């Protein structure tokens, strides 16, 4: 079986393998010049034969990635309405994300 890891970023958890492309919430310190992304909150690793479960994180495990692009999510529409008062309000929101390609799993 192929090695994989479970990482936590932006209060969400992702199962990643080398070569995967994931969309994560914006991270501090990431720009077009600084394209390397390090995920140090690794909750679980599997190297093909042995699994390591963190308490709460696996000690020296790091997942490395590189920035592919800045993307925006789907539009979420919220609609406020009050009956018989001729009041309605439509609000839209699009979340900004980083598209990251996983380059290495260091276990």
UniProtKB/Swiss-Prot annotation:
Q: Which GO terms describe its biological process?
A: translation
Work out whether the entry's keyword set contains Oxidoreductase: no
Report which superkingdom the organism of origin falls in.
Bacteria
Alphabetically, the GO molecular function entries are: rRNA binding; structural constituent of ribosome
Q: List the disulfide bonds.
A: none
GO CC entries: cytoplasm; ribonucleoprotein complex; ribosome
Q: State the PROSITE patterns in the record.
A: RIBOSOMAL_L21
| Keywords on record | Ribonucleoprotein, Ribosomal protein, RNA-binding, rRNA-binding
Subunit structure, interactors included = Part of the 50S ribosomal subunit. Contacts protein L20.
**Role summary:** This protein binds to 23S rRNA in the presence of protein L20.
- Give the similarity note: Belongs to the bacterial ribosomal protein bL21 family.
| HAMAP family membership | Ribosomal_bL21
Output this protein's name. Large ribosomal subunit protein bL21
Organism from which the protein derives: Chlamydia trachomatis serovar D (strain ATCC VR-885 / DSM 19411 / UW-3/Cx)
